[in-house]
Amino acid sequence: MNYLPQQDPQVFATIEQERKRQHAKIELIASENFVSRAVMEAQGSVMTNKYAEGYPGRRYYGGCEYVDVVEDLARERAKQLFGAEHANVQPHSGAQANMAVYFTVLKPGDTVLGMNLSHGGHLTHGSPVNFSGVQYNFVEYGVDPETHVIDYDDVREKARLHRPKLIVAGASAYPRVIDFAKFREIADEVGAYLMVDMAHIAGLVAAGLHPNPVPYAHFVTTTTHKTLRGPRGGMILCQEQFAKQIDKSIFPGIQGGPLMHVIAAKAVALGEALQDDFKVYAKRIIDNAQRLAAALQKEGFTLVSGGTDNHLLLVDLRPQQLTGKTAEKVLDEVGITVNKNTIPYDPESPFVTSGIRIGTAAVTTRGFGLEEMDEIASLIGLVLKNIDNEQALEEARQRVVALTEKFPLYQD
């Protein structure tokens, strides 16, 4: 940074502190990742200066010839990556992508089937504190109480009973493969639209390591960060028959001017995801997650559903008589960042929780491999079994430093 230190030393110092935090800590939050320098350069470019209401070739402002090029690049790369007929890359977030789909096919009060938040769903899948739960009549489905895998018979039964206009598949804390073909079969049976929110698994889908929802869903929404390793933002993929409606729902429906610097960064990230080395990266994410799952089980921890098929795992801390809130705090104190998370049928509130959610996308980007997963599991075991033992916690801090120093992040 050449100008910020002199122009605004307070902001510069805070950014520098955050850079040091990211370098010094082991990042295990499943929704986070580290973007490339190229993505950051695009997001910090002169594209941030340009207003571009509308779509390429149909703008409400002049001077859009170059932002048109970059948005077309992003759209075409998204379509190529996921095999979609249409892509809208303007949503500012995954939540707004979901909102646009709802506005396209629903009216206030319509019935929607969505996954229970405490079973792994998302706020925008019908939580009563979210616009989705306020505007629409969401009926919840969940996971089997024994296996903690989606109960497709329950989904079918509720679909038949409530006849939803839309079924929402996808999750924010579900460690197993989702059967999109089964969801489409159920949707067709009751005459519902199917929307898949693949925000967490988009990078794995792009690499061919998780079933692709695009052939099955009428609409697919996603974020562009998480496993896709792009800038924070959203995206919608849909069939061509819905393209005009979706585009209209985004602009002028719920957004004004698109963030062209973010769209430029999305284009870069989507280009990266089309490369062969991204497939290698995505495979390593899953390998690391499964190795970490096995190592945590050896440490005596209980995993929701018994393991993982993707990038994340949920640890049930009730056998350790710990809450997610306590675990998150003590792990952060030694340099391991996780988030407290509800588990299926959780007796605790969302502010306390009985579990933690762990993901491997960020540490895999950093270069961590299977041996490092064993060390992370050992560290988590050491800390959570000795939360009041300062000597053990200090040992963990030193081991975290040793590990992070081996894999420098944004140091040049």
From Swiss-Prot:
(6S)-5,6,7,8-tetrahydrofolate binds at L117, G121, H122, L123, S349, P350, F351. One of its GO terms (cellular component) is cytosol. It catalyses: (6R)-5,10-methylene-5,6,7,8-tetrahydrofolate + glycine + H2O = (6S)-5,6,7,8-tetrahydrofolate + L-serine. Gene3D superfamilies: Aspartate Aminotransferase, domain 1, Type I PLP-dependent aspartate aminotransferase-like (Major domain). Pfam families: SHMT (PF00464). Belongs to the SHMT family. This is Serine hydroxymethyltransferase. It comes from Geobacillus thermodenitrificans (strain NG80-2).
